[in-house]
Amino acid sequence: MVEAQLVLPAPAKLNLMLHILGRRPDGYHELQTLFQFLDYGDELGFALRQDGVIRLQTDVPGVAHDSNLIVKAARALQKQSGCTLGMDIWLEKRLPMGGGIGGGSSDAATTLLGLNHLWQLGWDEDRLAQLGLTLGADVPVFVRGHAAFAEGVGEILTPVDPEEPWYLVLVPQVAVSTAEIFSDPLLTRDTAPIKVRPVPKGNSRNDCKAAVERRYPEVRNALNLLGKFTEAKLTGTGSCVFGAFPNKAEADKVSALLTETLTGFVAKGSNISMLHRKLQIL
């Protein structure tokens, strides 16, 4: 196996709040959400190829190759830039699929930034984020790498700096269908818009929570268990749920109690993604 020339993280994200303001004529929903990164995520390795081939390697079952966002991101950048080089890409998967913590979108953003570096394209963040948006609404925030208040379908980003607590994230063993939740007839779609600043704290609910709890008892159970120790929230459309703690020791203590029956992890909130911290020292 060829040795990776560059190894980069693909961090998780949390939606600290998610409000649905209405449905647009094109069927998409107008949102307001607050993204923050975690110092925890997938890891991608990259090695240049001279033959133009994009090849993804992973041992994780269920990760489709040609339809994977990593491959789509690489081929889109290759096409748009006219680059004739290829890339071997290795994925070490830690983030759950269908978990609402941005695994696929983060992998795509890390791919765009990694290939931009190794192919020496010189694209700026604006151009990479614009390409990222064609892959998914959450990709641009990972490309930019700063915690953000997002509007529109999630593509209008305003950098913000919320507090950076420790989080316990629980991972119910179920993949939530985002399309199913957003088509739920009982989904709240008329929340009044809020201002970007001050950073939302008190008004920080997730409008998808009730619909997810109705359809996925595993998520409801995780929220109830975590809610005995701290305010339990849903990230995105789930399935992951999370709670904030003032320090790692308290998060670890609750994790030890809950992860006997549930999968989960403890991670620090970060307003600058660990991907961008790594890129800054290259």
From Swiss-Prot:
Its EC number is 2.7.1.148. GO terms for biological process: isopentenyl diphosphate biosynthetic process, methylerythritol 4-phosphate pathway; terpenoid biosynthetic process. Pathway: Isoprenoid biosynthesis; isopentenyl diphosphate biosynthesis via DXP pathway; isopentenyl diphosphate from 1-deoxy-D-xylulose 5-phosphate: step 3/6. Keywords: ATP-binding, Isoprene biosynthesis, Kinase, Nucleotide-binding, Transferase. ATP binds at residues 96-106. It catalyses: 4-CDP-2-C-methyl-D-erythritol + ATP = 4-CDP-2-C-methyl-D-erythritol 2-phosphate + ADP + H(+). InterPro entries: GHMP_kinase_C_dom, GHMP_kinase_C_sf, GHMP_kinase_N_dom, IspE, Ribosomal_Su5_D2-typ_SF, Ribsml_uS5_D2-typ_fold_subgr. The active site is at residues 13, 138. One of its GO terms (molecular function) is 4-(cytidine 5'-diphospho)-2-C-methyl-D-erythritol kinase activity. PANTHER family: 4-DIPHOSPHOCYTIDYL-2-C-METHYL-D-ERYTHRITOL KINASE, CHLOROPLASTIC. Belongs to the GHMP kinase family. IspE subfamily. Catalyzes the phosphorylation of the position 2 hydroxy group of 4-diphosphocytidyl-2C-methyl-D-erythritol. This is 4-diphosphocytidyl-2-C-methyl-D-erythritol kinase. The gene is ispE.
